[in-house]
Structure formats: structure tokens, C-alpha cells
């Protein structure tokens, strides 16, 4: 049960906002989930249903937008399904990755525009900086703006 009001998970649960973690079985977190599962076999994850749910949300949306924190699998997962609906309408990348090495993590929004993963007419921006600093500043500014409207 999620009952900590200072938790993002709490508020997502309370407001029926889904959270998708495409790489949940990857790395140290995945091994921790696996170890937990050894003693709690009633834990089930349906990654294919997650894919279906995410795809349904993307295709059913009148507009699609995303804040992508970091790069790699979570960023790619978000932009991937959106290319099949003509691209994201709104996109914000928060990244510390460099562009010069050709990695997906370092690719700027204009690269996703060139592939149709973000619409050319979309509102988009890349914010270069540590997300533990930039995300709270962005959230604070959005909340302040919402309060004034």
C-alpha cells in the first residue's frame, strides 16, 4: 500500500495515473525485484500488457506530450510509440548526456523531429543539466504558474 503523501507514487495511485517502467528487469533494480519474487511468488508483472496499455494511451490521445528525464530506454520507449501517431505534440528532454557521441541519450529533440517521433510543429526543448536540479525548478515554476492562473 502506498500511503506516503510526499511520494510521487502515492499521488499517481490516488489520481489513477499509470507509471510505466520499461526496463524494470534491467540492472540492479531488476535483480532486487527478482530476489523479492523468490519469496513472494504472487508478484506478477505483465510487460506485454504494459506495452498494450501504453500504446492504447498514445493512440487514443488527442495530444501527446512527455517530459523525458535522462535518456536510454525510458526516452526511447516514450518516443517510439509516438512516431506511429505522427509524433509527440510536446516534448521536454532533461539530460546531461553529450550529443557528440551519437548516443540516443545525447540526441537532442531535433533528432527525434527528423524521425517523426516529435512533430516538427511541436512545442519542444532540451534542458541540459542534472535532473535532480532542473526538474524541481521546472515543477516549481509550473506550480507557481498554475496558482497565478
Predicted regions mapped to residue ranges:
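Gly/Ser/Thr-rich loops at beta-strand to alpha-helix junctions
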Residues: 25-27, 70-76
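C-terminal functional extensions of proteins
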Residues: 63, 73-149
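Internal active-site segments that recognize and position negatively charged phosphoryl groups
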Residues: 1-58, 64
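A short linear-motif detector with a strong N-terminal bias
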Residues: 45-48, 69-73
